[in-house]
Amino acid sequence: MSQLDIKIRKLQDNGSTFRANIETLYLGGVRSAKVDRLHFEVPEEWKVCTISLHVQRLSGTLPDPQILDENNSVLVDRRWTLEKEGTWMLLAINDSGYIAMTKPGKYTCYDTIDTDTTTENITPSIYEPVSYTHLTLP
């Protein structure tokens, strides 16, 4: 499993903007799962927050968010890879009402061959002559 280390930095150009040091994540093949782990280095003020990772696929679908673990990491699963690309962001919330999010980044997956439909449909008319041949006694 590979790990992508992503640093979230706070910019103060016009108010506070949180941004990832990697703008586009390249996450393996379409429909892959649990191949990559994302590890986030978060700003100091986020260390007391619950941090969730939100994905929006290219089609507009918004899968359930993932909560970062105690190491600020998540496994990339099919929430990300069911479609070739989309956007992502982190959301940090604490009990005192603090809410912050990163500027959305992009992710992309490379095209793969559709393995869900590669099995050939064999109709009875194709295999019947073969099975009868083997059942014939001399």
Q: Can you say where each PLM-predicted feature lies in the sequence?
A:
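N-terminal assembly/attachment segments of tailed bacteriophage virion structural proteins
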Residues: 1-116
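Conserved small/polar residues in nucleotide/adenosyl-binding loops
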Residues: 133-138
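Charged heptad-repeat coiled-coil "rod" segments that mediate homo-/hetero-oligomerization
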Residues: 118-130
